[in-house]
């Protein structure tokens, strides 16, 4: 393709070059389950609606068929059932009151905390990275940094042997 020297625009009769944008890799079933669990926890944290109704609604959501439904159910139900225990685990690492966290950050911390405590087959770095990615996607501009810091400190406490072996 030749550009006209005066304008830098494509010469008459030529087509502009097609843009080649890198296509994002498909989301894993576990990533989708985490996204849906975060959305469910967000709804629950805001309204305290019946978790069964929220879960049923999300099971019917577009794209749920591509999620790991067992992992989703475990994350959503486990985080709600153990909210007080999980919050008590990460609360010492907060620089503010739990009530001052955004609902997205709080939901991401609950998902990440649940996985750190109960999903020991998932490496702690993966758990933290997934929570960070959730916060980047659904949260505020800098929230992911906060979630990263809190979960990193929690991982050192609840998975001390794994963290020590990797550092």
Swiss-Prot record:
GO terms for cellular component: cytosol. Pfam families: NusB. Keywords: RNA-binding, Transcription, Transcription antitermination, Transcription regulation. GO terms for biological process: DNA-templated transcription termination; transcription antitermination. Residues 1-32 are annotated as: Disordered. Involved in transcription antitermination. Required for transcription of ribosomal RNA (rRNA) genes. Binds specifically to the boxA antiterminator sequence of the ribosomal RNA (rrn) operons. Belongs to the NusB family. This is Transcription antitermination protein NusB. It comes from Cupriavidus pinatubonensis (strain JMP 134 / LMG 1197).
